[in-house]
Amino acid sequence: MIYRFKIKYNIKKLVEDNHIDILCIQEHCEESHLDSITIQQKFGLPNRCVFFNRQTAWANFGISIYSHYPIIRYGEINFNSEKNNSMWADILIGKDTIRVFNNHLQTTDVSMNGKKYEEYRSVKDWKGQARTLVNIVEQLKANFVIRASQAIQVRNLIDTTRYPVIVCGDFNDTPMSFAYNHIAGNNLTDGFRDRGKGYGHSFNGIKGLLRIDFISYDKSFTGLVYDSPHLPWSDHNPIIMKVKLKTTSR
């Protein structure tokens, strides 16, 4: 989540060190004393678009895209959720326009039940363990269904896009899931599979076993470099990808 000053400073350094031109944030937060313009200035990226899905007295929460290049159009994919939504932005690079999709799909949110399970397990409360496991399974099933619906919404918009497409975000699901595969369709290349190395996990919880954050692109792009460094200030590793637009006029 992007809200604490130190994290914003760390992201600024990440942007500068990696010469990042387009930055997609899935858990954007604007505190009352630090708005989008201020954050934008700290990141050093002059263009931005933000959508909020939850507002409180002290902060607004949502999703955002920051860009070195002009953003000429943008829109929200509204999931009617206080925690999750997606968005797109048409970005002008030279004389070419690309569309970037930034996604934060339904949160699995089983950590609390997982903690309860460990508590019951530590005292050998078998009935408590069983109840908690049932709750976890039911919660997982419900969230799978929600993510499937969200993935269909995102894919429908991808299919109507006439520009070169980049899709990224926190899918809260694995490469084996319906959500991942439906969004990928038959025309998007997974950046990790194209240029990544090793196991490639992106979520640092659950013993670092899961890759749930992705970047993919259509045939208009060539993947050059993929990196997902471990950073101590987030439970997700950032996905950093260098791609080349084949049709660029620059």
Can you name each region flagged by the protein language model?
Residues V134-V137, K141-N156:
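Active-site beta-loop-alpha substructure in enzyme catalytic cores
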Residues K12, D90, R155-D159:
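Generic structural signal for well-ordered alpha-helical scaffold segments
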Residues I7, I11, S32-D35, R147-Q150, ...:
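Stable alpha-helical elements in mature extracytoplasmic
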Residues A148-I166, F171-R250:
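Metal-dependent phosphoester-hydrolase catalytic domains
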Residues K115-Q139:
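A solvent-exposed, charged loop/short amphipathic helix patch at secondary-structure junctions
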Residues M1-I2, I22-C24, E138-F144, I166-C168:
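Second-shell loop/turn segments in exported
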Residues I2-F5, E27, K141-S149, I206:
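Soluble non-cytosolic domains of exported or imported proteins
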